[in-house]
UniProtKB/Swiss-Prot annotation:
GO molecular function terms attached to this record: toxin activity
Keywords, comma-separated and alphabetical: Disulfide bond, Signal, Toxin
Name assigned to this protein: N.vectensis toxin 7
Record flagged with keyword Isomerase: no
């Protein structure tokens, strides 16, 4: 009976810990910056020194007349050129 009680307590503790994502506080900003630099999101720019219109994540589309300048998942939206892309990667 005592071992059953111990197992029940362990299961209850694990349930509480696993259901609360903030039990272990994580520095989300640091992780996002680290992931962005690893995926090349910070090194993808528009040609001609023109700034990008903003970053996007993989599932999003760029506005009309623009193309995605990206490496892997992160990137920027730049003006479309005659060649079809206006990105410096």
């Amino acid at each position: 009976m005592a071992s059953f009680f111990k197992i029940a307590v362990i299961c209850l503790v694990m349930l509480v810990v696993c259901s609360n994502a903030r039990v272990i506080d994580v520095d989300d900003d640091y992780l996002m910056d680290f992931a962005a630099s690893k995926r090349g999101g910070q090194t993808c720019y528009c040609r001609g020194g023109s700034g990008p219109t903003g970053g996007f994540w993989g599932g999003q589309n760029c506005p009309a007349g623009m193309t995605s300048c990206r490496k892997n998942i992160l990137g920027n939206c730049c003006q479309k050129s005659k060649e079809g892309t206006d990105c410096d990667i």
